[in-house]
């Protein structure tokens, strides 16, 4: 992998990891276009750029990371538990689910879900506009919605934001809680992959890793900041359209043999 490859993949990871469009398919397509094959070394690289993207979330919400916000973090950890438990118990079955076809169809289904949720969502019925006022019940509901993200192509942020909106949170508040929930979720996932692939780091080009990490951090920071402004004014329908179109294109590429599992 070259430095150019690491820059491109860092940008793609940083932009797509926390937007409700799922980073999985984007990384697959871009890696294919760059001529990169799946390898232990490339998996290690993906872990590093995920950590870079997650660190951007930490910086954005740094003011929330203190003992004064202990009640908020209790709710975040409660929301994290369903994914942690179910993900661990069903880890082998989840791995078997991963096919490019599954990713493509989940893109389309996720896009349709966005339209349905926006159809029934009403700003007048919003009960919570401050992330600190999210209750334990609502946190747990969002946590169970996050479990859907175990299905490849679903989008963790998309699932949790939808769960928050259906629980009475404003779009912005749902996004805030989703990103706070990403901190333990992503660190746990990245930490697990890091330990599993620790031997692969010995043969890595540290410059490539460092560049990917920094680029992913910057891209993620900008993407999340812009998204938080976006959801205060607009619906998720644009992301729904994008997901459906992207899913159809992905199915076409699979059918043509351009992308394979």
UniProtKB/Swiss-Prot annotation:
- Major location, coarse class? membrane
Q: Would the keyword Transcription regulation turn up in this protein's UniProt record? A: no
Q: Where in the cell is it found?
A: Cell inner membrane
One GO BP on record is: regulation of cell shape
Please tell me whether the keyword Transport is annotated for this protein.
Answer: no
**Main enzyme class:** hydrolase
What's this chain's function? Answer: Catalyzes the dephosphorylation of undecaprenyl diphosphate (UPP). Confers resistance to bacitracin.
An additional note in the Swiss-Prot or TrEMBL entry is: Bacitracin is thought to be involved in the inhibition of peptidoglycan synthesis by sequestering undecaprenyl diphosphate, thereby reducing the pool of lipid carrier available.
Q: What protein am I looking at?
A: Undecaprenyl-diphosphatase
**Organism expressing this protein natively:** Nautilia profundicola (strain ATCC BAA-1463 / DSM 18972 / AmH)
């Amino acid at each position: 992998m070259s430095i150019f490859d690491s820059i491109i993949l860092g940008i793609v990871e940083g932009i797509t990891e926390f937007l409700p469009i799922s980073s999985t398919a984007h990384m697959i397509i871009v890696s294919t276009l760059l001529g990169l094959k799946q390898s232990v070394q490339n998996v290690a690289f993906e872990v590093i750029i995920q950590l870079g993207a997650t660190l951007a979330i930490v910086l954005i919400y740094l003011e929330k990371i203190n003992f004064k916000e202990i009640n908020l973090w209790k709710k975040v950890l409660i929301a994290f538990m369903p994914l942690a438990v179910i993900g661990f118990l069903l880890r082998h079955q989840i791995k078997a689910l991963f096919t490019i076809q599954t990713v493509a169809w989940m893109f389309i289904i996720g896009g349709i879900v966005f339209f349905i949720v926006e159809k029934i969502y009403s700003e007048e019925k919003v009960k919570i506009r401050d992330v600190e006022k999210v209750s334990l019940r609502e946190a747990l509901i969002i946590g169970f919605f996050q479990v859907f993200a175990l299905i490849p192509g679903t989008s963790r942020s998309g699932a949790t934001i939808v769960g928050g909106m259906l629980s009475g949170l404003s779009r912005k508040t749902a996004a805030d809680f989703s990103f706070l929930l990403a901190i333990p979720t992503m660190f746990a996932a990245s930490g697990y992959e890091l330990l599993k692939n620790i031997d692969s780091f010995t043969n890595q080009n540290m410059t490539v890793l460092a560049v990917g990490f920094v680029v992913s951090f910057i891209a993620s920071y900008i993407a999340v900041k812009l998204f938080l402004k976006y959801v205060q004014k607009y619906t998720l329908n644009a992301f729904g359209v994008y997901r459906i179109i992207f899913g159809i294109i992905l199915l076409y590429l699979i059918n043509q043999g351009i992308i394979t599992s």
